């Protein structure tokens, strides 16, 4: 079972693809986009996508507080469970953040999985991606590679450390911004 917290254009794209292969539980503040709640997702799903906004602060830095709040909630609940949860971060976060979170949230295996979507074509972009980057530690990245291989059999899946994956996201965004 797969959980997805956040059903904006990224979370919805993940849902549209994964629902064809797994039972998928979704949660969003907009109840019309949810088929579950956060607690049910945490208890039932060993693999949880976090697709939440990380808006820019006034100083230009990335505001990761929404994601951290959700990770804290997941960590508090999973601390009492027998199995750890693989948390797949889709939100844009500064390099080094996933590594910091893996030290802070000991009951979670946090992996950064950058998205390269356009808002107008998010579902199509996600369904037709040719590369998937999983940034984190083993065994989480190995388990997730198996899951992603089933859903994206033709995509090239790259396992790396989380900081490199976060840098790839930032560098790609920078490159795309120069093309505007």
Residue ranges and their predicted role:
Residues 1-43, 47:
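NAD(P)+-binding Rossmann beta1-loop-alpha1 motif at the extreme N-terminus of oxidoreductases
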Residues 10, 92-96, 176:
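Gly/Ser/Thr-rich loops at beta-strand to alpha-helix junctions
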Residues 44-45, 84, 129:
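Local beta-strand N-terminus motif with an aromatic residue
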Residues 50-53, 91, 136:
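Glycine-rich, N-terminal phosphate-binding loop of Rossmann-like dinucleotide-binding domains
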Residues 53-58, 164-166:
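A short, flexible beta-alpha/helix-coil linker loop
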Residues 55-121:
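Rossmann-like NAD(P)(H) cofactor-binding subdomain of soluble oxidoreductases
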Residues 102-111, 122-180:
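Internal alpha-helical scaffold of NAD(P)-dependent oxidoreductase catalytic cores
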């Amino acid at each position: 079972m797969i959980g997805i917290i956040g059903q904006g254009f990224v979370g919805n794209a993940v849902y549209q693809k994964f629902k064809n292969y797994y039972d998928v539980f979704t949660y969003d503040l907009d109840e019309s986009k949810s088929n579950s709640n956060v607690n049910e997702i945490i208890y039932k799903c060993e693999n949880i996508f976090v697709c939440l906004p990380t808006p820019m602060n006034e100083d230009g830095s990335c505001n990761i507080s929404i994601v951290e709040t959700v990770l804290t909630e997941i960590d508090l609940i999973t601390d009492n469970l027998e199995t750890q949860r693989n948390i797949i971060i889709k939100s844009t976060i500064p390099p080094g953040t996933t590594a910091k979170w893996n030290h802070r949230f000991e009951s979670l295996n946090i992996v950064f999985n950058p998205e390269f979507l356009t808002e107008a074509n998010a579902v199509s972009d996600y369904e037709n991606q040719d590369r998937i980057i999983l940034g984190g530690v083993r065994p989480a990245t190995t388990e997730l590679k198996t899951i992603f291989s089933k859903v994206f059999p033709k995509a090239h899946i790259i396992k790396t450390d989380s900081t490199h994956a976060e840098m790839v996201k930032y560098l790609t965004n920078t490159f795309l911004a120069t093309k505007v």
